[in-house]
């Protein structure tokens, strides 16, 4: 409720849920958003295997992040199939999907290139611009020019500053649209300390441990429209594209209807039998 109160106070009309690798919270999020008069956008920040979801070799088979948002019911059905396969077939430290699944189940989805843990930012940080470009073009060709976006973020990290101009260059050279996002893990800047405490609890560390997992800045909160336009004043179209994406995403859950699973009848028999 506090999150939606904050969104309404900032004049926001839509909000997406993109939990890492899971979709457990989607129904509760949808209900709460609807009750608050905010348009809910259902999605997931999936883990994409570096090779295939079946490859599970230590120190070789990691993952890259990718944002997937549901445009419609087809997209939702495809997304839950992939997320489920991530657990039943691709689990290796994280529930991983792969490009084979994306090729099969990409219809009805909008794709964003993700945060610093995405395949494209990783390639850029490694100094491999050509690989980043090839990857971006692969995703654009798969999802379609109107459904794939280069994601721009700026949380004040050194890596953000290194990657951001290269992402803008990549988008302009390929004609792939950009979208500005903020990796919101808490509601206000003041919540950053509480986030650090929760991470300590999660990882079994204390706030004084020098090697504890932490967000290096306090910029991972829900930012206002003005804050985002200030951050990305050099590419205002990236902020405007957030509205375009929100308009494209129109999936809604339907409650109160009995939906039985479909079972194919054995050969020579009808379903009624």
Functional labels for PLM-detected ranges:
Residues 1-273:
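Phosphodiester-processing cores and adjacent nucleic acid-binding clamps
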């Amino acid at each position: 409720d506090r999150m939606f109160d904050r969104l309404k106070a900032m004049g926001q009309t839509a909000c997406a849920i993109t939990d890492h690798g899971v979709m457990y919270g989607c129904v509760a999020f949808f209900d709460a958003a609807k009750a608050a008069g905010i348009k809910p956008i259902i999605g997931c920040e999936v883990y994409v295997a570096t090779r295939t979801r079946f490859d599970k070799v230590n120190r070789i088979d990691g993952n890259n992040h990718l944002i997937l948002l549901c445009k419609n019911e087809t997209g939702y059905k495809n997304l839950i199939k992939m997320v489920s396969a991530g657990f039943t077939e691709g689990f290796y430290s994280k529930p991983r999907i792969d490009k084979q699944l994306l090729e099969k189940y990409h219809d009805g989805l909008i794709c964003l290139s993700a945060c610093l843990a995405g395949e494209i930012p990783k390639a850029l940080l490694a100094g491999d611009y050509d690989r980043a470009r090839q990857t971006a073009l692969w995703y654009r060709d798969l999802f379609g020019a109107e459904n794939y976006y280069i994601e721009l973020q700026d949380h004040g990290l050194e890596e953000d500053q290194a990657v951001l101009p290269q992402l803008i260059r990549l988008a302009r050279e390929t004609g792939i649209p950009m979208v500005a996002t903020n990796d919101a893990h808490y509601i206000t800047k003041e919540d950053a300390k509480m986030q650090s405490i929760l991470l300590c609890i999660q990882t079994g560390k204390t706030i004084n441990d020098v090697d504890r997992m932490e967000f290096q800045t306090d910029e991972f909160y829900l930012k206002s429209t003005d804050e985002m336009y200030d951050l990305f004043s050099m590419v205002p179209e990236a902020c405007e594209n957030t509205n375009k994406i929100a308009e494209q995403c129109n999936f809604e859950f339907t409650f109160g209807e009995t939906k039985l699973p479909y079972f194919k009848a054995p050969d020579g028999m009808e379903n009624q039998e």
